[in-house]
Design a protein with these regions (language model features):
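Primarily secretory-pathway and cell-envelope proteins
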Residues: 21-74, 98-102, 106-119
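Aromatic sugar-binding surface patches on proteins
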Residues: 77-85
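A short tyrosine-centered beta-strand micro-motif
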Residues: 82, 93-99
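Secretory targeting signatures
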Residues: 1-26, 39
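Amphipathic, non-transmembrane alpha-helical stretches in extra-cytosolic proteins
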Residues: 61-65, 79, 93
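Short, flexible loop/turn segments at beta-strand junctions in immunoglobulin-like
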Residues: 87-90
Length: 119
């Protein structure tokens, strides 16, 4: 291997090492039931007090989306799996869920999920 590629290799390895810490919080299973929306969040990092969980629900009808719910609330993220219940009543139909976890000014996790509510 030529020595001229060593700095590039070091830069790439440094980028991967830095990005590894960004995946400490992830969304897991999201379901809808009688109690509302059940959201599971996995935190593989240290516990965090007063993280913000933001939930936006859009009803999808054809090519049109309309917002039916939006709320941000403070949550405590313990290490491991965390479960949160969002009390919301949804009519049967198709929805898109936009879920975000913020710690301070930093977005720790975000995901868009499809949800079908049966009649």
């Amino acid at each position: 291997m030529s020595w001229k590629y060593v700095p590039l290799l070091i830069l790439i390895l440094t980028a991967f090492a830095g990005a590894a810490g960004c995946l400490s919080t992830t969304f897991q299973e999201v379901t809808y039931g009688d109690d509302g929306l059940e959201i599971s969040v996995e935190n593989s990092g240290k516990p965090v007090e007063k993280a913000v969980l933001q939930v936006t629900i859009m009803k999808v009808e054809g090519f049109k989306q309309s917002e039916v719910y939006r709320k941000a609330q403070y949550v405590d993220l313990d290490s491991g799996r965390n479960a949160y219940t969002i009390p919301v009543d949804l009519e049967p139909g198709s929805y898109k869920l936009f879920l975000i976890v913020l710690v301070g000014d930093e977005r720790k996790a975000s995901v868009i999920r499809d949800l079908e509510v049966a009649p």
